[in-house]
Amino acid sequence: MADFLGMMKQAAQLQSKMKAMQAELDQIEVEGLSGGGLVKVRMSAKMEVRGISIDPSLIKADEREVLEDLLVAAHGDAHRKAEAAMQEKMQALTGGLGLPPGLGLG
């Protein structure tokens, strides 16, 4: 019975820490780049796009397809960085709990 109560207490603590981590992830911002920095996407570690910056040289009718490709690439770069930031926070939170890797608690 004591083991069960201990596990319940640990689960409650983990839930509290997860809430705090979600707030921290919202504060972390990463920037994805493409085209040598001509296109930038800012994203929170919660995968929310915060902003997009496009170099004026790309805003031409004949550059539309290039711009679209660069936007996709910059978003992908930002997404990878946000995922890495989230994984780092998750590892810090769950590192001592012996949970299986990749367990999505977020």
UniProtKB/Swiss-Prot annotation:
Gene Ontology MF annotations: DNA binding
Family in the record: Belongs to the YbaB/EbfC family.
Organism: Rhodopseudomonas palustris (strain TIE-1)
Top-level taxon of origin: Bacteria
Known function: Binds to DNA and alters its conformation. May be involved in regulation of gene expression, nucleoid organization and DNA protection.
GO cellular component, one term: bacterial nucleoid
Record Gene3D superfamilies: Nucleoid-associated protein YbaB-like domain (3.30.1310.10)
Source species taxonomy: Bacteria, Pseudomonadati, Pseudomonadota, Alphaproteobacteria, Hyphomicrobiales
A Pfam entry, by short name: YbaB_DNA_bd
Entry keywords, A to Z: Cytoplasm, DNA-binding
Main location: cytoplasm
Protein name per Swiss-Prot or TrEMBL: Nucleoid-associated protein Rpal_0620
Keyword Iron-sulfur among record annotations: no
InterPro entries: YbaB-like_sf, YbaB/EbfC
Compartments in which it is found: Cytoplasm, Nucleoid
